Amino acid sequence: MNGNRFVGFCAAALAAWTVSAQIELVAPADGATVRQMHTIQREYAKAPWAQCEKYFDGAENSKKLRSRGSTPVPVKLQWKGDATEYQVTVRRMPDGKVVLDQAVATNCVEVDSLDIATEWEWTVSAGSDKLVSHFKTEDRLPRLVRMTGSNNCRDIGGRRGLGGRRIRQGLVYRTAGLNSNAPVEYYSTDEILELEKAGKLKEMGHTGRALHRKLKTGEKLSSHAKKNRLVKRKCFAPGKRRFTDEEVARILKVYGIRSDIDLRSDDECYGMTGSPLGPTVTWFHISYRAYSGAFTEEGLAINKKVFGVFLDDANYPIVFHCIGGADRTGTVAMLLEALLGVPEEEIWRDYLTTGFVGVVSDPPHKKSFGDAVKKLKEYPGETLADKAEAFFLKLGFTKDDVQRLRERLLER
């Protein structure tokens, strides 16, 4: 090697060493446990069951809880260094699944919606140097996930079921609607008053007659047209998109969704021909009956269709939802979690987590959900899981089907 080449080689080596010497991983500390929930979300999640209902009584605690919504707290990865670009990679351990692989020009990057109670490896590299560290996500339910544009999004996984086995994470997600409901146009308050003046309001069906009686007794109408519920034009276009193209691509990459179980009515899904997540996702449109309605003859037939989707391994990962992710979605989640052996208290916790976005935080919702749980308890069996199995057998599934579903969704 001649002198000039040798000097060049040494300079390059020194530059690489300088990058290495100046990179310092700052946070999280190696081996640290990180949180993915806001403080008030954590307080609710870890509170004794007897204290949980204070968060859903319409008081200040409930308002504070709703102020944070259902968004997860991102894990912030920080380091020191003066390189112009870094490659940051985050892997789930021990399987090594990559959840982030990104080139950045800053000294910080955020990652969210990680599996709970899981060890993660993160690396930062610049030039030929690579520094490695590890952290663990807190064992705190629920696993909130981000789908920017929708809300009330979470993994049903992580909860413990039969034999203390966790429900597998990353297989079944419950959310609010992936697009808006089909629009409905309502008569304004002024238009309703004109209809009453013309003698036409009482001829406009049940809602028109009810509004007519209100006006005759001197009761005031709501200033919000939707609350008066007199339909002028019903479902005339598909619901608006909630996701950008970029967010759809991210959702598919991060969560790998293959199937979308849409529990909304035909009217709500007017004009839709597929999932808002695109053609790679199979859309199962199954109009659902919530709460006690799930146990009627019609409800049983509907449940057979819904849970038939869960029995096909090719359909996973699955997202299921209605529009708010509370009533119909909550009933499906309750039946599935009960079958997997989740304790009743934890099933209630999952349902009431929807209070993070201000739904179900009132007595009527809780009564309706309680009535559905009571209906399930009418089935034979010693435990709630036994009763859920009897319910699934009533739907027409076999014991082998039940066992196969449990093995698919519970960790070994």
Task: Place the predicted regions along the sequence by residue.
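Ser/Thr-glycine-rich phosphate-binding loops at phosphate-binding pockets of nucleotides
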Residues: 324, 328-329
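N-terminal signal peptide c-region/cleavage motif recognized by signal peptidases
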Residues: 16-20
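Bacterial N-terminal signal peptides that target proteins for export
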Residues: 1-10
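Cys-dependent protein tyrosine phosphatase-like superfamily
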Residues: 21-319, 331-412
